[in-house]
Amino acid sequence: SVDSYIIARKISGLSEKTLYLYRMVLKDFFLTVRKAPTDITTNDIRAYLYMYQSKHDISNRTLDSKRNIICGFFNWLAAEEYICKNPAVNIKPIKYERKHKKAMTQLDLEKIRAACETKREKAIVEVLYSTGCRVSELEHLNISDVNFETKEVVLFGKGNRHRVSYLNAKAEVALKEYLNERSDDNKALFVYDKKPYGRLKKPGIEQIVKKIMER
């Protein structure tokens, strides 16, 4: 059933990186719980999340991304009628504090927003601020790494380490406006504004941010 779920998610447009993340999380879950999907209970999911956090000392934010993947799988099983009772229904989101860089005040942010001259510049600023991602992570983002329904953004750093962050309302609007004005078919989230519209690299992003800051 995990394979069927991965295929379904691939058809829906998720990237290979995201699919790999889903597969690894679900694989670890079932290796730990050692039960068939039809036998999983709500308590099994809660116990797994509790034990995983205790063992790996991860933040609530990271734990919630795992919860979301596991619950998404069982929601799909229920929707496809593979299971009669959905054990994920009563698993609530895990609360965590969404931190932003302390160095930037709200006034600083508004000045930067006002200095943006293009939809691409605005989208870059809003995504960087909303997700707290590094420029190197932004460079490697594909459009399919962004889920506008859940506002999730799957970020991959060094050593293929992953984390899930989120778009706030301003970032979502800015990103959609930027993507809607693009005429290319590049899978990259951000591209150069001249042909052949290749993936916007780290030096290019840094140069754009520098110009905005200097205005």
What residue ranges belong to the model's regions?
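Conserved catalytic core of the tyrosine transesterase superfamily
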Residues: 1-215
